[in-house]
């Protein structure tokens, strides 16, 4: 089976490396090089770099026009495998592949159709999520389910953590799906009545209100890592929150909302909220390295009693 691989994200790199061991990858479709770093020099994504290193033809157009369709048609692929690309495919593009098109989606479809399933699961405080290998349809993330595997989300897991987990789980699931397809399996239709949807996070998604519950705040902190990251102020200085947990207790009702009320070397830096205690686990001062809460506490002047304020 000749495969046309489509991705623009590092989350798909392990899948790509595994697929080329077992199948002929006749081409790769990815996004164009983008400016990166202080110098804003054009930089390839890791999928493009890996494909070039393996002498696999790469297409990186701005738009999927007729010229791109003809280039893909000339490669004579059997199947398209998509994992985090960022563009919508029209019917004439999907029709190029006689054995169909499949997609790796990091949720338990039909839950969280859309572009931010990992972040949405964490933002909503889900304890379980998963990976779905689905056939592709014109309606986004509505195709038949070929393979599905669930996993637990720990209370302190970030979007970055779950992305790494999805990356490690996906190669074997894709191989399983391709084996099923080779045997004529068409997949199991989704229950569209149970579908939920998610959209892009925005920069302002990193704003928090300490009047919310500790559960809601820690979900936002963890969901927004690695982007856009939650920023607050402490003594007129910006502080970035990278990881948090929470306690469902109200021990400090008389203290100010957002106040640092305690330090526990086993649990975290305690912050009072509208309901419960926020446990800060990893923080950063802009331009400096990310610190665990112990290093942040030991490297700061008296923190207990200081108050975090929201950035609006």
UniProtKB/Swiss-Prot annotation:
Catalytic activity field: L-methionyl-tRNA(fMet) + (6R)-10-formyltetrahydrofolate = N-formyl-L-methionyl-tRNA(fMet) + (6S)-5,6,7,8-tetrahydrofolate + H(+)
Gene Ontology MF: a single term: methionyl-tRNA formyltransferase activity
Family per record: Belongs to the Fmt family.
Amino-acid positions noted as binding (6S)-5,6,7,8-tetrahydrofolate in the UniProt annotation, renumbered to this chain: 107-110
Alphabetical keyword list: Protein biosynthesis, Transferase
Biological role stated in the UniProt entry: Attaches a formyl group to the free amino group of methionyl-tRNA(fMet). The formyl group appears to play a dual role in the initiator identity of N-formylmethionyl-tRNA by promoting its recognition by IF2 and preventing the misappropriation of this tRNA by the elongation apparatus.
One Pfam family, short name: Formyl_trans_N
PANTHER family xref list: METHIONYL-TRNA FORMYLTRANSFERASE, METHIONYL-TRNA FORMYLTRANSFERASE, MITOCHONDRIAL
Cellular component terms per the entry's GO annotation: cytosol
Taxonomic lineage: Bacteria, Pseudomonadati, Spirochaetota, Spirochaetia, Spirochaetales
Enzyme Commission identifier(s): 2.1.2.9
Record protein name field: Methionyl-tRNA formyltransferase
Annotated CDD domains: FMT_core_Met-tRNA-FMT_N, Met_tRNA_FMT_C
NCBIfam families: fmt
